Amino acid sequence: MFRRACLAAIAVCALGLTTAAHAQGYKEKVKEFRIGLLGGENTQDRLARYGKFQQLLQEKLGIPVKLFPAADYAGVMQGIAAGQLEMASFGASGFAGAWLDCKCIEPIAVPQENDGSTYYYSVLVVRADSGIKSIEDMKGHSLAWADPNSTSGYLIPSATLKAKGIKLDDGAYFSKTGFSGGHEQGVVAVLNKQYDGAVTWTSGQGDAAEGYSRGNLRSMVDKKMLKMSDIRVIWQSGKIPNGPWAIRTALPDDLKKVVTQFLLDLPKSHKDVYDDVERGSGIGYAPATMELYHDIIELRTAEQRANRS
């Protein structure tokens, strides 16, 4: 009987050690967790928005968490593909492009708007005093895209305009087009009369006078860079799936589970941090699936074919 008790105790201890080792397993393989921050906002503001997020995730993982702000969307996409970043919050098009490039990432969480939806909108904005009130009025005027890998800042509006028969070459319809370097920069260029119009993103929900509930316009209003009375929205897209938090597929499963649960819990445990990261309000994150981005991946694939032809 004593022997059976000893064997039972040894078994329990062994199970405990195995469980503990499994729980800490990813720490032996992953010494630091690197997060890529998309361009489109000045570096200081990006690092400030993610500072508390970085600290909380580091406490949860028990390994160093580092932030890497990229100059543009492509920098984050390339960092993920090269294994130099573990995770990033992508736009839908950026995620689709990164997935098409390396097939090495998977979506884990997607922001939900205040009504529980997981969609947002692309909008075209002009100065309120410009006299421009429609896409038709934009003929002969200049248009700023945000970034070639932005969903709302390029992919969707350019595809929509092409579907209307509008040619995007300089002088064909618009006097000129160009990439501003990001959403924030595009709106600033309009305010400074460097471009007549710019495309950016918004939740399309909430008080329009405050820049809506979430998005670039809301962020700029909150930072006192913009008064909504100074601009006019002349076009809005159809629904676009919110971009996901995506993580490298090759990472240990236990690490991916901890990070995913951290994101899902964040709005309840630290709503202020969630609002900082997502640039406005929302009810939280939902689990993300590849299915949500199927149409965007198809659109990116078609764009790549067209560019090669």
Description of each model-found segment:
Residues 2-8:
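N-terminal export leaders
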Residues 69-73, 83-102, 110-111, 183, ...:
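Beta->alpha turn/N-cap motifs
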Residues 144, 148-252:
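Pocket-lining segment of extracytoplasmic ligand-binding domains
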Residues 35-60, 70, 93, 117-188, ...:
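Bilobed "Venus flytrap"/periplasmic-binding protein-like clamshell domains
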Residues 8-16:
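Bacterial N-terminal signal peptides
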